Amino acid sequence: MPAPFEKGSEKKGATLFKTRCLQCHTVEEGGPHKVGPNLHGIMGRKSGQAVGYSYTDANKKKGVEWSEQTMSDYLENPKKYIPGTKMAFGGLKKPKDRNDLVTYLASATK
């Protein structure tokens, strides 16, 4: 079972985003979709709902509402959490890294 989310370091999360996520995602309002969707406004949104992005049926049907905890659970092992997702990222195994990244995402995607 994934570790409970605990607020982490936004600064360390920003660094993780730049090194592990930026090649496929943007976070700013109106930012473009890349290989993965723009993440602006993701917290509180259901999976597979970013307008203009072509999701797999698995992402659309999962129906998870993104929160700090669900995002942390997903980022531990995306392909296990949503079998059939096209997200190629293998996941962040360390709870601290997930906490830092999710803390950054919660702030940067508002």
Swiss-Prot record:
UniProt KW keywords: Electron transport, Heme, Iron, Metal-binding, Methylation, Mitochondrion, Respiratory chain, Transport
One of the record's GO cellular component terms: mitochondrial intermembrane space
Binding-site list for heme c: 21, 24-25, 87
Entry-linked Pfam families: Cytochrom_C
PTM: Binds 1 heme c group covalently per subunit.
Annotated localization: Mitochondrion intermembrane space
Modified residues (N6,N6,N6-trimethyllysine): 79
Gene3D superfamilies in the record: Cytochrome c-like domain
GO molecular function: electron transfer activity; heme binding; metal ion binding
Function: Electron carrier protein. The oxidized form of the cytochrome c heme group can accept an electron from the heme group of the cytochrome c1 subunit of cytochrome reductase. Cytochrome c then transfers this electron to the cytochrome oxidase complex, the final protein carrier in the mitochondrial electron-transport chain.
Protein family according to the UniProt entry: Belongs to the cytochrome c family.
Protein name: Cytochrome c
Upper classification of the organism: Eukaryota, Fungi, Dikarya, Ascomycota, Saccharomycotina
